[in-house]
């Protein structure tokens, strides 16, 4: 089916003669066959958002409908790849087109020339259905890739073709003539089905103490990370990609500056995967859409990333989906809405911004897959509020749709406190659901310690305001002890060095032992001050400096060091009280 162009407004064009087309159908626009998607239908007129630059299009040029929705290719070869927002392989296009891509440039997302050794797990006569495992695809230098039956497909196996196969060649033939290849196509805007959702009672461990202990998120949960320029969003996301409990990382660079994305593309291949010792990129899929790319492709990029994440989830893997940033995605939505002449909402964003964000974040979750395995997609969405204003619409809509807020503070970043998570603003809605896991796996009493630490930090904020007015020396020793204990907690527990091998990640058991010792120091020093021991004498023991060095010890050495420090603390305080 084909129509003709009758109107153009930036990335949005209108074509007539497409009466049989459907919503979200992919079309090719103009003589250069630019990729587009139908977003509105009125009679035989279709409004299309074009995923490429529309300059040079002329009225009357043909528009050809494909009959298919916008879909991604899913199969062996995804890991380690870099795509744009509509899953065009950027490395292959750069080799063919050069540094600047021509309009209408198109290549299959997955390499059609590479051979994979298919080792089948089914035999003729077996009955298969969506989610069933067909076998494993292997290739030199690539991780094993399970091949599963796409959702909605059922039948009895008629023939199995093992051995060397390209991704588009039939590997399993079903009775009735249907064929299954190593790859499948899936519409990006349709969530992949699962057998059932599992309760969010297992944490998504990030390796960052401030997040795991104070603001945990469940596996399959959602978190929003607002932060202005220079607050460490990218460094935090790299730390999460490297150390978080995720088998696969899908990174969506949505609308960020070109130089920032260049840095990410340059740094990610050089990051070492601590699990395997190989490059981190080997278990990462990157979707790149810079701010100078067409806004329509930016709007589609997060759905592309989500469809890829759900595909790996259905293999029984834990997937971390990172979006940087949802603010740029919302700006693309705002521009498209303006081109469609829709009624604007707050700050010009469309009135359906909240529902679109909620619908997207609902695709996260820990599930039992159709094949009976357990998989999860955990979403971490960065937000770039102008001037760090958390009251702007994108941040507020994200907060309503997610389970945790990891707010980054410019003040902490300027003080070189990383991760610059502001504990006075951040929160989680899943702390109570995950408390049982931390009590079992980290240590009994973990929740009580966390609450005590929060109260200590809150008390420090109150005393800091008083100290700014009257000076620290005017405070009583008990109040100055609160300031000193909170300082030790901030510098020795909440702050982590991404460059220190022992401190870059922290298992829950180590974090529990550290937190227990920090708070024990505060309680016992407080008792000594109450008994008349001068605070200065306690600080002169040097035990505070030893507390700060706990973070630099490997996890296996922390219990022994904590026991020695606890004994020295008892001895020092007993000596001071006896004087």
Curated annotation (Swiss-Prot):
Binding annotation for ATP: 227-234
UniProt keyword terms in alphabetical order: ATP synthesis, ATP-binding, Hydrogen ion transport, Ion transport, Nucleotide-binding, Translocase, Transport
Reactions the enzyme catalyzes: ATP + H2O + 4 H(+)(in) = ADP + phosphate + 5 H(+)(out)
Gene Ontology BP annotations: proton motive force-driven plasma membrane ATP synthesis
The protein's Enzyme Commission number: 7.1.2.2
Pfam families per the UniProt record, alphabetical: ATP-synt_ab, ATP-synt_ab_N, ATP-synt_ab_Xtn, ATP-synt_VA_C
GO molecular function, one term: ATP binding
Keyword ATP-binding: yes
An annotated GO cellular component: proton-transporting ATP synthase complex
Stated family: Belongs to the ATPase alpha/beta chains family.
General function of this protein: Produces ATP from ADP in the presence of a proton gradient across the membrane. The V-type alpha chain is a catalytic subunit.
Name this polypeptide is given: V-type ATP synthase alpha chain
Organism: Anaeromyxobacter dehalogenans (strain 2CP-1 / ATCC BAA-258)
Gene label: atpA
């Amino acid at each position: 089916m084909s129509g003709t162009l009758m109107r153009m407004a930036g990335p949005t064009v209108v074509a007539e003669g497409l009466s049989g087309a459907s919503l979200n159908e992919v079309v090719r626009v103009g003589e250069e066959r630019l990729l587009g998607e139908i977003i509105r239908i009125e009679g035989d007129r279709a409004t299309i958002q074009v995923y490429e630059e529309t300059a040079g299009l002329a009225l009357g040029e043909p528009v050809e409908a494909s009959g298919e929705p916008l879909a991604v290719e899913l199969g062996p070869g995804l890991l380690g790849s870099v795509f744009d927002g509509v899953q065009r392989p950027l490395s292959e296009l750069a080799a063919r087109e050069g540094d600047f891509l021509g309009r209408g440039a198109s290549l299959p997302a997955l390499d059609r020339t590479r051979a994979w050794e298919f080792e089948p797990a089914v035999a003729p006569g077996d009955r298969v259905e969506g989610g069933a495992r067909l076998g494993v695809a292997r290739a030199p230098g690539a991780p094993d890739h399970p091949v599963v039956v796409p959702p909605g497909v059922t039948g009895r196996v008629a023939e199995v073709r093992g051995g060397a196969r390209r991704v588009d060649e039939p590997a399993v033939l079903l009775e009735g003539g249907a064929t299954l290849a190593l790859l499948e196509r899936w519409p990006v805007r349709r969530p992949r089905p699962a057998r059932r959702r599992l309760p969010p009672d297992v944490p998504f461990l990030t390796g960052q103490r401030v997040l795991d202990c104070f603001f945990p998120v469940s596996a399959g949960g959602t978190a929003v990370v607002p932060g202005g320029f220079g607050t460490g969003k990218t460094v935090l996301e790299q730390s999460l990609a490297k150390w978080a409990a995720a088998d696969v990382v899908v990174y969506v660079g949505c609308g960020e500056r070109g130089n920032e994305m260049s840095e990410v593309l340059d740094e990610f291949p050089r990051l070492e995967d601590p699990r395997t010792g190989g490059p981190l990129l080997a278990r990462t899929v990157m979707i790149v859409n810079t701010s100078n790319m067409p806004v329509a492709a930016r709007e589609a990029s997060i759905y592309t990333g989500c469809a890829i994440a759900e595909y790996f989830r259905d293999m029984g893997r834990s997937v971390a989906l990172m979006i940087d940033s949802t603010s740029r995605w919302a700006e693309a939505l705002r521009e498209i809405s303006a081109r469609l002449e829709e009624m604007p909402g707050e700050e010009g964003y469309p009135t359906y911004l909240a529902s679109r964000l909620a619908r997207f974040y609902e695709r996260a979750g820990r599930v039992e897959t159709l094949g009976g395995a357990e998989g999860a997609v955990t979403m971490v969405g960065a937000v770039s509020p102008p001037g760090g204003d958390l009251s702007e619409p994108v941040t507020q809509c994200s907060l309503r749709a997610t389970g945790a807020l990891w707010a980054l503070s410019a003040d902490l970043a300027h003080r070189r406190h990383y991760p610059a998570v502001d504990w006075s603003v951040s929160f989680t809605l899943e702390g109570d659901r995950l408390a049982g896991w931390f009590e079992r796996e980290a240590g009994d009493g973990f929740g009580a310690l966390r609450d005590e630490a929060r109260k200590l930090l809150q008390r420090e904020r109150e005393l800091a305001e008083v100290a700014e007015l009257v000076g620290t020396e005017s405070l009583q020793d008990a109040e100055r002890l609160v300031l000193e204990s909170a300082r030790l907690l901030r510098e020795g527990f909440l702050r982590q060095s991404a460059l220190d091998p022992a401190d870059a990640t922290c298992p829950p058991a180590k974090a529990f032992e550290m937190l227990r010792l920090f708070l024990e120091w505060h309680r016992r020093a407080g008792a000594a001050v109450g008994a008349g021991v001068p605070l200065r004498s306690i600080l002169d023991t040097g035990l505070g400096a030893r507390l700060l060095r706990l973070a630099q010890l490997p996890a296996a050495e922390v219990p022994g060091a904590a026991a020695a420090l606890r004994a020295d603390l008892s001895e020092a305080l007993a000596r001071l009280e006896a004087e």
